[in-house]
Amino acid sequence: MAKVPSRSTRKRVRKQVADGMAHIHASFNNTIITITDRQGNALSWATSGGSGFRGSRKSTPFAAQVAAERAGVAAQDYGVKNLEVFVKGPGPGRESAIRALNAVGYKITNITDVTPIPHNGCRPPKKRRV
């Protein structure tokens, strides 16, 4: 066997960010939390489904809380202290995700609802008859 030359690997330098933004996308089926820097570059993210919840348990407030804690702990490696929170969607995990980020130790400076609202755009889906 010929010896394969080893590639030199450099340790990735983690940038230090003091202020960040938390984007919470709470749909009826799942909750996605992304923590970014001021420019919008993702530092960490977590989902209810990726946190071990499957099926209808993904859409619970507790699953959103666990996902927010995972994203928050991962973003602390970058030195984030203050968060501006943007919440999108009507899901059940909206409020519990914000509370979980607060419990991790972040100072939440601002909470903004950025749920897209149509100005009479597309026709909505028909109502379910069960």
Curated annotation (Swiss-Prot):
Keywords: Ribonucleoprotein, Ribosomal protein, RNA-binding, rRNA-binding. Pfam families: Ribosomal_S11 (PF00411). One of its GO terms (cellular component) is ribosome. GO terms for biological process: translation. One of its GO terms (molecular function) is structural constituent of ribosome. It comes from the Bacteria. Part of the 30S ribosomal subunit. Interacts with proteins S7 and S18. Binds to IF-3. Belongs to the universal ribosomal protein uS11 family. NCBIfam families: PRK05309.1, uS11_bact. HAMAP family: Ribosomal_uS11. Located on the platform of the 30S subunit, it bridges several disparate RNA helices of the 16S rRNA. Forms part of the Shine-Dalgarno cleft in the 70S ribosome. This is Small ribosomal subunit protein uS11. The lineage of its organism: Bacteria, Pseudomonadati, Pseudomonadota, Gammaproteobacteria, Alteromonadales.
